[in-house]
Amino acid sequence: MTDKELTGYHSVLNIFLLLFLHWPFVWNWHWNVFEELEILSIFVLFVVVWDFLWFVLNPGVSLRDFGPKRVWWHKKWKAGVPADYWSGILFSIVLFLPETIVVDPIIGIAKILILLLVNLILTTLTIALYPKAY
């Protein structure tokens, strides 16, 4: 997404996460392209939420530190958050579009909304319940 350096740690961790998310296919899920795109959509949104929660849960930083002055490794910011977050959310939605268009628009839109709302609710609860965030 950006020109940030990908470390060995992040490479191995992302591979592990992708393998973990594909685990249901081992247990009798029938693979198809729509299921694959759904897994990738979940992964992309997970990475965005995970990156943000680092600021919420890390005892060495505060949510007050979340901004372009202190978070120098995110080069581009839009509307108060890293541009990568907006790109990730949009890409996560785009990955659901083929299923939404081809299979069932109602179910596809419902899956997108559920994915976004569940992550928003859980992130909001984490911020509200974790005392270091404020």
Where are these predicted regions, by residue range?
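Aromatic-rich, lipid-facing transmembrane alpha helices and their immediate juxtamembrane interface loops
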Residues: 1-134
